[in-house]
Amino acid sequence: MVFNHEIKGNTLVLKLSGDLIGEDTGSSVLETASNAIQDKVLKCIIDISALRYINSSGIGVLITILTKFRNKGGDVYLMKPSESVQKLLVITKLNAIFQIIQSEGEVL
């Protein structure tokens, strides 16, 4: 998996691509999110439009990020999930926990 990030105001924007398939893969993403929270960033947009595959460990990474932000009064938004990832979100009922958005403008 490859990711990059940017902070826009009080929002962390993470762009993930490839496969999110484990704690090792997601550890740097978690570290980036934790650092942003320490810097008083309250919102996180995770652009998953280029994410091809996600397994249970990858879902755990997303849930950990969500928990960290919500514990500080913030929130996490998943942006533009692919059809296969969207199906997974529905099957796992995570679409009811995460807010799904189509553009950064819905949050920024």
Q: Locations of the language-model features?
A:
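Short acidic-hydrophobic, aromatic-tinged amphipathic segments that line or gate anion-handling sites
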Residues: 99-103
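Acidic phosphotransfer microenvironment of two-component signaling modules
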Residues: 83, 105-106
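Absolute protein N-terminus
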Residues: 1-2, 108
